[in-house]
Structure formats: C-alpha cells, structure tokens
Amino acid sequence: MRVIFIINHDDNDSHLIFASGRDSFGRACQAAAIMRPSPSSAPAPLRQASSELTLQTPGPGLHEFTREASAWVAQQGMDSGLLTVFCRHTSASLCIQENAAREVHGDVLRWLDRMAPENDSYAHDDEGPDDMPAHLKSILTGVSLSIPLIDGRLALGTWQGLYLCEHRRRAHRRHVVLHLLGA
C-alpha cells in the first residue's frame, strides 16, 4: 500500500511525501525533517529591473542584440532569475536563433517571405505592400522571449543569440523592453 502525506513546515513550505509499508507516517515525518530548509538557506528576496533598448535597423533582417541585453543583465547584479524581452511593435518581432552560421538567417527570411508574401491580396495596405506581410511575420515569430538567468548569465546555448526581426523594407527605430525578475 502506498500512502501520500502532505507535510507542512509553515505557511510557505509543504512537501508531498510518498511512503509505503509499516510505519509509513513515521518514515514520512523523518523524510520531511530531512527536507526542512535551514534558516540560513532562506532564499534571497526577489528583485526586478526593467529597461528599454532602442535598436536602429537598416531594413529587413535579423539584427542581434545579445551583447546589449547581456551587458544590461550583468549590471543588475542578479544571480538567478528570468529575463523577459518584449518588442513594442506589430511589424517587427523577436527570436532566438543561430549566431554562427549566417546563412540560417537568409533561410529564415526566405521561409517567412513564402509564408507571408507581399504579392497577396491584403485589405490592409495603408503603409505599403510590405506592411501586412510584416504583421503576419510578427505573428509567426512572436514579440516576446523568456530566457533563464543562471549564475548571473543568460542561459543561452553556445550557438544561440537574441535577434530583432525587422519585417519592413525600410530602416526603423525599434524599441525592445527588458524585464528581469530574480535574486
């Protein structure tokens, strides 16, 4: 027989303990005592910080801003947490993508062009033939990212970089919000 006990240490700390056989409750209590955090290991209080990057794009493409985001995160002095990145536009977007083989960027852009071509019949064309496809590409790639912060660094893979995807043909000034929650 398997028995489940919920052991509460205080209002903020509870554990599910699985025990079986004779004296299940006694073993569950022993396990809970081992799992109880010591007062010295109390978690650091959460902090948060936010900033806005302004990125000038020369036109369509993937424009890396990993260095700028990483430098800002380092200035915050947090060891662990979560960075949320948000693009404040509907015709640009964000992605985490290959940072070594640049031909990947061309392949991604050509794929997006096939998914949302300029020569389709869109009702919304007030700002030109590249406007509605830019909105659709933004939907496909998204406007927010979440990146864990571990040991004071963004937990990006070796070949990963943070990119603003510019979907319009002409140069734009784009705004990207950084929000870090951590300790």
Walk through the language-model features, giving the residues of each:
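Short helix-onset patch at the extreme N-terminus, typifying the N->h transition
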Residues: I7-N8, S41
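Short, low-complexity, charge-dense intrinsically disordered segments
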Residues: M1-I4, D10-L16, S20-R22
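Active-site histidine-anchored catalytic micro-motif
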Residues: F18, F25, C29-A183
